[in-house]
């Protein structure tokens, strides 16, 4: 807002976690739930879609994306209730699914994920500025890729649920099966015309942050060891491994151990 010309039109909507909102003048801020979606996030997602539909060829859609957007903007597709979306999300988390597996399912159950925001706003110029929290920095995986092509399918979502032995709620199963059979449209894929005027740009990632931490410790005379920027798996298992490493190394020297990635809680 501070850097936008005062006489230029500006409107917008930001959705963030509870207790993370900041005062604004021209852009509305809504707080919602993470990691399980709630009604405030659903309502905000529907409003965001409505705002995007009103954009024309002379408009610019600026999308600021960071991790957590999948839950904060979780408006279920028609035929799936918010309760059912919460149930399947909770089941995926409890099953130890990777963030890739979770996103594969959620992209096909919500209205903005998997490139659907770009599809809705395709009349306008679009620029998505992305802070990555995922291994590999794929725009399609960050916040479930609202502005990026989706390489996965409803068949993939069903396969993930079956592999994890999750029995989805009826609405979820019916939607995914209808989509897999071609009776409902899937998410927009690479090459879809809706992405012709949309640019996805990763402006910050975990590796850059980790290297900044390494430099900070070294500048203060503390040796730093970057273990990995691709840590994944169950959070408890990863924590035990890190604790064991700290216990073994701390006996001999002062050392900062640094790692990044995305674990499943």
Stretches with model-predicted labels:
Residues 93, 99-166, 176:
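A glycine/threonine-rich phosphate-anchoring loop and its flanking beta-alpha core
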Residues 2-8, 26-28, 53, 76-87, ...:
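A glycine- and small-aliphatic-rich helix-loop capping segment at beta-alpha/alpha-beta transitions
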Residues 1, 241-265:
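C-terminal non-catalytic interaction/assembly regions of soluble proteins
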Residues 13-16, 62-67, 93, 128-134, ...:
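Short beta-strand segments
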Residues 124-127, 149-241, 245-248:
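Accessory alpha-helical/coil subdomains and C-terminal extensions
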Residues 13-57, 101, 105-106:
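Glycine-rich oxoanion-binding loops at beta->alpha junctions
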Residues 10-14, 78-103:
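Short, acidic/small-residue loops that bind anionic groups at enzyme active sites
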Residues 14, 31, 63-65, 99-104, ...:
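General beta-strand structural signal in soluble alpha/beta enzymes
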């Amino acid at each position: 807002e501070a850097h936008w010309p005062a006489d230029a039109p500006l409107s917008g909507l930001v959705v963030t976690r509870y207790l993370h909102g900041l005062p604004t003048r021209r852009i509305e801020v809504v707080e919602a739930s993470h990691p399980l979606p709630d009604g405030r996030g659903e309502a905000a997602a529907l409003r965001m879609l409505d705002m995007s539909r009103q954009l024309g060829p002379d408009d610019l859609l600026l999308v600021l994306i960071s991790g957590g957007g999948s839950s904060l903007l979780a408006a279920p597709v028609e035929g799936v209730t918010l309760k059912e979306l919460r149930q399947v999300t909770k089941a995926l988390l409890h099953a130890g699914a990777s963030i890739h597996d979770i996103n594969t399912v959620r992209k096909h159950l919500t209205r903005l994920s998997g490139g659907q925001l770009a599809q809705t706003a395709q009349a306008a110029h679009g620029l998505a500025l992305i802070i990555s929290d995922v291994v590999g920095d794929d725009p399609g995986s960050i916040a479930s890729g609202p502005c990026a092509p989706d390489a996965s399918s409803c068949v993939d979502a069903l396969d993930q649920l079956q592999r994890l032995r999750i029995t989805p709620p009826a609405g979820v199963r019916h939607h995914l099966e209808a989509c897999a059979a071609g009776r409902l449209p899937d998410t927009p894929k690479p090459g879809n015309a809706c992405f012709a005027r949309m640019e996805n740009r990763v402006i910050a990632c975990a590796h850059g942050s980790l290297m900044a931490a390494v430099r900070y410790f070294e500048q203060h005379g503390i040796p730093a060891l970057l273990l990995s920027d691709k840590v994944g798996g169950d959070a408890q298992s990863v924590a035990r491994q890190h604790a064991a490493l700290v216990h073994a190394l701390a006996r001999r020297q002062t050392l900062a151990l640094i790692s990044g990635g995305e674990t499943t809680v």
